[in-house]
């Protein structure tokens, strides 16, 4: 049995020892059935949030609406929620899809009121009373193509029809909740199926924070047929590049910066080949993604091994590898810091990178002295 499941069951056991019902539910049970390692584990219990906190004083509440607390057990974060409805069956019937609506009891029994195990075996994404489920939380509609991409399953006809009839509700979902689902869709093994489903259900115009045209969705569907696996930021960069697609998602600052960098160097590669300076400024990881994007668009691309060889030949790969620091430069010139220092360090960096001087403190100081004499 997987270690994550074991840790979840230890929480279940402890809750039961204190007189509460408790079960492992959701994606962990699904993954357990298909032989996939669960990324995390959720537990539901008849205990109230206050009672959960009494048992686990260090637990913190992350979702007041669903009365969910996170309990850390040996570096594994376990979400513990109070049962919705009067029973475990009521709780499971209110979940997004049948494949996520199974519970694992302490004795190993599977509670499956909606036929999730059968749907799992048949590779079907189906919602129990889909109109009601999507009205409760419209984001669930976006999770259908996400799971189609991740698992390679097909969506049941009734569920797909319910998405078509309810898709406008998605526009009211907070944009902060959209990023995770779209990211998982983009990096799934069967991502082309996810984009296909966005198109077929008519869901794509209603995704908050992303203005997707039909042409963009169909282009992403075709691009995603490639067997090569592009990292998520590469797919986000492609969305930025494609016409008629604008982004208003509140992505993390560093993620936005990296995506913009990838987009910039995709543009640079239209007119320039990689050289030492350009590769150094971009970084090997960005350059690799840029070449993967070029390949997806049918453009001539540089093989990753060639990029690695050029990268390995660089005298330095980051400024922190310089043999001198800003403190060394200030001490040598006996001057306080200021704009001159940043300019001087940039000059040193360029000279070392272009192999005009050795990356050795004595050589750099001598070079600085020669420049001072010349000026």
From Swiss-Prot:
Record's catalysed reaction(s): a tRNA precursor + 2 CTP = a tRNA with a 3' CC end + 2 diphosphate
An annotated Gene Ontology molecular function: nucleotide binding
E.C. numbers: 2.7.7.-
Needed co-factor(s): Mg(2+)
Transmembrane segments: none
Source domain of life: Bacteria
Binding site for Mg(2+): 40, 42
Coiled coil: none
This protein's record includes keyword Cell membrane: no
Keywords: Magnesium, Metal-binding, Nucleotide-binding, Nucleotidyltransferase, RNA-binding, Transferase, tRNA processing, tRNA-binding
Biological process terms in GO annotation: tRNA processing
pH relationship of activity: Optimum pH is 9.5.
Binding site residues for CTP: 27-30, 95-96, 100, 137-146, 177
UniProt keyword Magnesium, yes or no: yes
Enzyme kind, highest EC tier: transferase
Family that this chain belongs to: Belongs to the tRNA nucleotidyltransferase/poly(A) polymerase family.
Function according to Swiss-Prot or TrEMBL: tRNA nucleotidyltransferase involved in the synthesis of the tRNA CCA terminus. Adds the two cytidine residues to tRNA.
Protein name: CC-adding tRNA nucleotidyltransferase
Species, as recorded: Halalkalibacterium halodurans (strain ATCC BAA-125 / DSM 18197 / FERM 7344 / JCM 9153 / C-125)
């Amino acid at each position: 049995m997987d270690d994550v499941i074991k840790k979840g069951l230890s929480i279940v056991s402890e809750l039961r020892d204190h007189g509460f019902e408790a079960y492992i539910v959701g994606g962990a049970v699904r993954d357990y059935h298909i032989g996939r390692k669960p990324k995390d584990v959720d537990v539901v219990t008849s205990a109230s949030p206050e009672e959960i906190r009494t048992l686990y004083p260090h637990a913190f509440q992350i979702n007041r609406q669903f009365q969910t607390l996170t309990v850390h057990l040996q570096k594994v974060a376990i979400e513990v929620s109070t049962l919705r409805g009067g029973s475990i069956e009521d709780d499971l019937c209110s979940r997004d899809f049948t494949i996520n609506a199974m519970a694992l009891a302490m004795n190993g029994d599977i509670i499956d009121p909606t036929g999730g195990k059968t749907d799992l075996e048949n590779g079907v994404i189906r919602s129990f009373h889909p109109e009601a489920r999507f009205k409760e939380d419209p984001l669930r509609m976006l999770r259908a193509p996400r799971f189609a991409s991740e698992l390679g399953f097909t969506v049941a006809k009734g569920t797909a029809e319910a998405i078509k009839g309810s898709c406008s509700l998605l526009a009211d979902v907070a944009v902060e909740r959209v990023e995770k689902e779209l990211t998982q869709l983009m990096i799934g093994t069967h991502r082309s199926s996810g984009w296909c489903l966005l198109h077929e259900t008519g869901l794509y115009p209603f995704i908050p924070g992303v203005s997707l045209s039909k042409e963009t969705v169909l282009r992403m569907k075709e691009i995603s047929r490639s067997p090569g696996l592009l990292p998520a930021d590469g797919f986000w960069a492609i969305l930025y590049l494609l016409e008629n697609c604008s982004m208003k998602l509140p992505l993390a600052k560093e993620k936005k910066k990296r995506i913009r960098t990838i987009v910039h160097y995709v543009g640079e590669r239209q007119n320039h080949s990689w050289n030492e300076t350009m590769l150094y400024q971009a970084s090997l990881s960005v350059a690799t993604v840029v070449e993967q994007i070029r390949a997806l668009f049918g453009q001539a691309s540089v093989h990753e091994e060639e990029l690695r060889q050029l990268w390995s030949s660089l005298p330095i790969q980051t400024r922190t590898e310089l043999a001198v620091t800003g403190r060394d430069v200030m001490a040598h010139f006996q001057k306080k810091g200021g704009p001159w220092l940043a300019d001087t360090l940039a000059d040193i960096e360029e000279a070392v990178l272009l192999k005009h001087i050795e990356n050795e403190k004595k050589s750099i100081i001598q070079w600085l002295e020669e420049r001072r004499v010349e000026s």
